[in-house]
Design a protein with these regions (language model features):
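Low-complexity, intrinsically disordered or signal/transmembrane-proximal segments
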Residues: 18-20, 28
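Active-site-proximal alpha-helical scaffolds that flank and shape metal-associated catalytic sites
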Residues: 102-164
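An amphipathic alpha-helical core segment
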Residues: 137-220, 224
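An N-terminal structural lobe/cap that precedes and organizes the functional/catalytic core
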Residues: 34-121, 204, 212-225
Length: 234
């Protein structure tokens, strides 16, 4: 069933580009190393000022962080990078990536990011007292209000995320498949990433156990190493 849905998603994605964008509607290709754990980054972000937007900007701002960017945004970008480094180096995450079959091993990082966001969405009450739908509503309002700080190449992602409630859709298997199809449409080289949903189906319980072991450690890491807004130019 899932294999038939990616062509439809491509049509919907094309249609979404015709929506009134937040700033720009220029398509952007993705690198396989581009992280996709949006929900995790947003939950871990400081919920003040521009930190929610900054928690997503880490994938779109490369190199030294421009001093012209507001300090809370800079700090959130630096935290995003620290979270990614901690995640990529963690033995549990490496174990999860090794569960991915050779066919999709090149995209194991993307798949695990998205799968972990699925488990975060389905196990949300274990990590937040705020209902998920309330959280996503708050996030979308914040992103709209502060979108003028986002780089052009980030605008299409924000537009799609908000219009299609990407974060809320992570609770359902079909939502994860749609997310993978959306990523597939933006990869630099042809792939069948949408079919990667079978990796979640086949390894669901093991991957969920990995996530439930890992995420509390990530939360502790963030709490133990806060980023100061002073000199956050990493």
């Amino acid at each position: 069933m899932f294999s038939k849905l990616c062509p439809l998603l491509r049509i919907l994605l094309k249609a979404s580009r015709q929506l009134q964008p937040l700033v720009s509607k220029t398509p952007q290709a993705l690198d396989p190393k581009h992280s996709m754990n949006y929900l995790a980054h947003l939950l871990l972000a400081d919920k003040t000022s521009n930190s929610l937007l900054g928690s997503l900007m880490g994938d779109f701002v490369k190199g030294p962080v421009d001093e012209a960017i507001p300090k809370p945004l800079r700090a959130a970008i630096v935290q995003h990078r620290r979270v990614d480094s901690f995640t990529d180096a963690h033995t549990i995450v490496k174990r999860s990536k090794n569960r991915i079959s050779p066919e999709f091993r090149r995209y194991a990082g993307i798949l695990i990011d998205v799968f972990y966001d699925h488990f975060l969405a389905t196990q949300w009450v274990s990590f937040s007292d705020q209902p998920l739908n309330s959280f996503t509503t708050q996030v979308y309002a914040h992103l709209k209000q502060n979108s003028h700080f986002a780089p052009d190449k980030m605008q299409r992602t924000l537009n799609y995320m908000i219009h299609y409630d990407l974060l809320g859709s992570y609770q359902q298997m079909n939502g994860i498949h749609q997310a993978l199809c959306g990523i597939e449409s933006r990869l630099k080289r042809p792939s069948q990433l949408g079919r990667g949903i079978i990796e979640l189906q086949q390894n669901h319980d093991a991957l969920r156990a990995d996530f439930m072991d890992f995420f509390p450690e990530l939360i502790q890491f963030v709490e133990d190493s806060p980023v100061s807004t002073e000199g956050a130019l990493g």
